[in-house]
């Protein structure tokens, strides 16, 4: 049977600067700033939701989509913390929708080639895997700056905060450096671990960890 045509029916973004190129690429799509309004008004007019927003709002948007019986593609990291991940896992089982976490690192040609080598017996007897990151490329592990900055007129700061505690804006937080603040992001580990560590788990079918150790400097 022929595949059904995929249509981008609606776009949603709290930042008009970031939304502009997407709106230009999909001029036929409806546009909203508030995902809640879009879900309330348009839920009968779309089948699936793709979520690519700051980590702290992943769970609430993903859970709300599944409660509407919408299939869900949720960018990594799946959620801000483990509790939220468990809630989404339970919801996916309850509502019987198709779900996938976006992880380009596990979908690249390198992953496919490694799988071919492994299945051909070219890589055997693996007992240890070492992984190293190239991040962070942003400030992290420092106090929240006391020097606040004006919010750009194109950004709806209240909607961007979402589930996070209300706070003043700081310079250069959006669109990328929010990853370095726990109230919004998950640091270099949350941003890159799925790309760097994930392929080993997928290739070797490792399952859940049985023990984790860590250290940090101050």
Q: Whereabouts are the PLM-identified features?
A:
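Rossmann-like dinucleotide-binding domain that binds NAD(P)(H)
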Residues: 157-218
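Short, solvent-exposed loop/turn elements at domain surfaces
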Residues: 19-21, 138-140, 168-170
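A contiguous active-site-proximal alpha/beta segment in oxidoreductase catalytic domains
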Residues: 71-73, 79-159
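A structural signal for well-ordered alpha-helical segments within the folded catalytic domains
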Residues: 59, 63, 86, 108-112, ...
């Amino acid at each position: 049977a022929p595949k059904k045509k995929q249509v981008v029916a609606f776009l949603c973004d709290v930042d008009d600067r970031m939304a502009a190129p997407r709106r230009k690429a999909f001029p036929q799509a409806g546009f909203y700033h508030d995902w809640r309004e879009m879900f309330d008004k348009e839920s009968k007019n779309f089948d699936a939701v793709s979520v690519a927003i700051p980590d702290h709002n992943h769970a609430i948007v993903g859970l709300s989509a599944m409660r509407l019986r919408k299939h869900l593609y949720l960018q990594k990291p799946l959620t801000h913390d483990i509790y939220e991940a468990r809630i989404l896992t339970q919801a996916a089982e309850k509502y019987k929708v198709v779900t996938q976490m976006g992880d380009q690192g596990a979908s690249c040609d390198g992953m496919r080639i490694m799988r071919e080598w492994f299945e051909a017996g070219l890589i055997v007897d693996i007992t240890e895997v070492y992984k190293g990151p190239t991040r962070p490329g942003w400030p992290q592990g420092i106090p929240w700056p006391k020097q606040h900055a004006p919010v750009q007129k194109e950004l709806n700061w209240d909607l961007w905060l979402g589930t996070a505690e209300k706070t003043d804006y700081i310079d250069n937080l959006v669109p990328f450096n929010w990853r370095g603040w726990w109230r919004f992001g998950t640091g270099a580990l949350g941003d890159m671990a799925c790309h760097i560590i994930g392929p080993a788990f997928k290739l070797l079918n490792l399952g859940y960890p049985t023990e984790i150790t860590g250290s940090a400097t101050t």
